[in-house]
């Protein structure tokens, strides 16, 4: 069974990329390249305590934020926690994030089929028009994030809070080489973010994929042409694109 090496931390307790690749008869291996540290935890808890009074909903666009939100919700009184889960609309940017949010227990999710921030921003604008809401949305983000949603919707509709910071891990190159040596079935390496290891991807003699255009463009600037740039930043799109490339280029 061929294996895709994903340069990301494996999500717990369930990583949707495993299932997506298994669907196409492929295995997955994971190597984290970033360390994630929760920040502004007290501010997040304070905002959650008043979330239904202050905001008309939440925006979550990554599984890392979903995990941070889960930890914050565990600090809430069970009655209040259930009210938040049942009554708070929450916008996600694709099926992977939507699934992680639903696993937390949120009932009112929107944006599963959006795929990109620009599309989600349009959906939110339509939602505001339909529901006639006047309160802003609480947008939970990482330290490094694209601001397309905030720019399109404006500060009066989006209140952003950084809930985690990232730092590149050391010795990633050595870990990748060791993993490739131990697992000769690895034929793809997938980059999920613009990090220093991207400058070395073409030295591993594997096919290269990226989760989206931001990382894809970063690789091109470094002189590396990815074989696949996933059309949408989600597991199904990535896995199907890799399989399609292999089928088109099989001898």
Curated annotation (Swiss-Prot):
The keyword Lyase applies. GO terms for biological process: protoporphyrinogen IX biosynthetic process; uroporphyrinogen III biosynthetic process. It comes from the Eukaryota. GO terms for cellular component: cytosol; nucleus. It catalyses: hydroxymethylbilane = uroporphyrinogen III + H2O. Gene3D superfamilies: 3.40.50.10090. Belongs to the uroporphyrinogen-III synthase family. Its EC number is 4.2.1.75. Residues 231-251 are annotated as: Disordered. One of its GO terms (molecular function) is uroporphyrinogen-III synthase activity. The keyword Hydrolase does not apply. It comes from Schizosaccharomyces pombe (strain 972 / ATCC 24843) (Fission yeast). Pathway: Porphyrin-containing compound metabolism; protoporphyrin-IX biosynthesis; coproporphyrinogen-III from 5-aminolevulinate: step 3/4. Keywords: Heme biosynthesis, Lyase, Porphyrin biosynthesis. This is Uroporphyrinogen-III synthase. Coiled coil: none annotated. Catalyzes cyclization of the linear tetrapyrrole, hydroxymethylbilane, to the macrocyclic uroporphyrinogen III. It is an enzyme of class 4 (lyase).
């Amino acid at each position: 069974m061929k294996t895709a090496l994903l340069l990301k931390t494996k999500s717990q307790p369930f990583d949707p990329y495993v299932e997506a690749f298994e669907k196409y008869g492929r295995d997955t291996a994971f190597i984290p390249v970033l360390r994630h540290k929760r920040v502004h935890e007290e501010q997040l808890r304070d905002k959650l305590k008043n979330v239904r009074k202050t905001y008309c909903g939440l925006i979550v666009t990554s599984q890392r934020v979903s995990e941070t939100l889960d930890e914050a919700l565990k600090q809430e009184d069970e009655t209040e926690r259930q009210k938040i889960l049942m009554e708070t609309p929450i916008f996600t940017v694709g099926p992977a994030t939507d699934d992680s949010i639903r696993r937390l227990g949120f009932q009112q999710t929107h944006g599963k089929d959006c795929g990109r921030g620009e599309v989600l921003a349009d959906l939110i604008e339509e939602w505001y028009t339909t529901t006639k809401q006047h309160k802003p949305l609480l947008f939970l983000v990482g330290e490094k994030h694209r601001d397309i949603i905030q720019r399109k919707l404006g500060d009066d509709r989006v209140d952003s809070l950084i809930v985690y910071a990232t730092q590149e891990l050391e010795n990633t190159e050595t870990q990748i080489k060791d993993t490739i040596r131990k697992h000769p079935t690895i034929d793809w390496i997938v980059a999920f973010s613009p990090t220093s290891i991207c400058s070395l991807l073409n030295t591993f003699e594997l096919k290269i994929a990226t989760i989206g255009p931001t990382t894809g463009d970063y690789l091109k600037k470094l002189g590396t042409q990815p074989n696949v740039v996933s059309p949408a930043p989600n597991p199904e799109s990535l896995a199907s694109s890799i399989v399609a490339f292999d089928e088109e280029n099989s001898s």
